[in-house]
Swiss-Prot record:
Catalytic reactions of this protein: 4-imidazolone-5-propanoate + H2O = N-formimidoyl-L-glutamate
Naturally occurring in which organism (per UniProt): Bradyrhizobium sp. (strain BTAi1 / ATCC BAA-1182)
Phylogenetic lineage: Bacteria, Pseudomonadati, Pseudomonadota, Alphaproteobacteria, Hyphomicrobiales
Protein name from the UniProt record: Imidazolonepropionase
Residues engaged in binding Fe(3+): 73, 75, 243, 318
Note on cofactor: Binds 1 zinc or iron ion per subunit.
Amino acid sequence: MAERFDRIWHNARLATLREGQPGLGVIEQGVVAARDGRIAFAGPRSDFAADGDAPERIDCAGRWITPGLVDCHTHLVYGGDRAHEFELRLAGASYEEIARAGGGIVSTVAATRAADENELVTGALPRLDALLAEGVTTIEIKSGYGLETATELRQLSAARALGVRRAVSVRTSFLGAHALPVEADGDKERYIDRVCDEMLPAVAQSGLADAVDAFMENIAFSAAQTSRVFAAAKALGLPVKLHADQLSNLGGAALAAEFGALSADHLEHTDEAGAAAMARAETVAVLLPGAFYFIRETQKPPVELFRKHGVKLALATDCNPGSSPLTSLLLTMNMAATLFRMTVDECLAGVTREGARALGVLAETGTLDAGKWCDLAIWDINRPAELVYRMGFNPLHQRVWRGR
């Protein structure tokens, strides 16, 4: 009896990104077959059942198929716009001057608090659509622009709603420990009390967050304050991730590892002890070249140390209104290769397999393996390096989410 599938893509070249395979796990003359939204077969044509059939057979005409892209760190949902601040910066205004004038994160918090859920969804959709147009099939979206319970929950709900409005998998992170709200009057300890005692229990009860994030930095929260948030999150059964070592080395990478974090992100100032701790904890390093570029950082993340210790490397846009208004994972890869000297293979793994690992969803997506969701990106390219090499160019032929 013929083996039946829902859809078959044939005459394709596959970059499977499978673990344990050299390079990108390339298969020439490949076939992908989907059943019930999942990959039922991904491999050489010679291994595919001769009688395999489906109502829809797509001839890829030699195009490349990769796993659907994963953007594992974004702040996609927010109110307002800060393009005017960019103009002020170009005219010579400092961050401090902009903040004193009511700009910076304070302005985004005010605009986000003033927006209802529909307005937040409507504002985020063009940003999401830009990412989907480049083959993104899984995206992480953080809260962190409410800094009080109701708005944080509204941000998370809006993020989940995006996954209903569009064919994309959305993972959400609660980022209540992002910044200090104006009404806290500079009292970080009291605000962290509120995060741990009020916000986190409400978030956990709502079921709207898949993870808990925090920003550990001199301008944000200390190691002790971050530890309190993480301990409370773990007690509620929520995994953690951390904005770490972006502007200074406060030991964020090591603290993330101590709590078994899914990922530590930014990491420009991470030292060897931090890298080694991340390797032992299997915490993924998420590098964010868009923010590095946009705010003109000079300290690069220690890619060689991460390689030395075997830390997995992911890449993400860090899409946000203040430091990385970026909605292109393709450009992100080019930036990582050019600015951080990452290889083509590292970049492509960083926006597929390792991005999925950083979100704790590698069992479900990120590689072309039977049993995973059939999330694909099909490209009009001659070789995978083009996806990293070219700038301002989108060769996506088709995006497939869960087999359709």
